[in-house]
Amino acid sequence: MNQKMESMAEEHPDATIDLRGVKCPFNFVKTKLKLEAMESGETLSVILDPGEPIANVPRSVQEEGHALLGVTERPDGLFEILVKKA
């Protein structure tokens, strides 16, 4: 899942949440709560561990109706996703 979209480089997120070390399903719950506190159209950067978190959180936010703008694997082995709130 090493997909990088141009929009991530150009996009400056309205908020960032660092969820390294947070296990499933708590990483999605924390992401969902953060998105609920944001305005429609705002963007959220989420830092996730490899494995289950990067497999599950992007899918779950899309199932909630939000837009996944990009996924980037960082040099430190973590992943960053950019989500636009519905």
Describe the residue ranges of each PLM region.
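Amphipathic, hydrophobic secondary-structure cores in small proteins
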Residues: 19-73
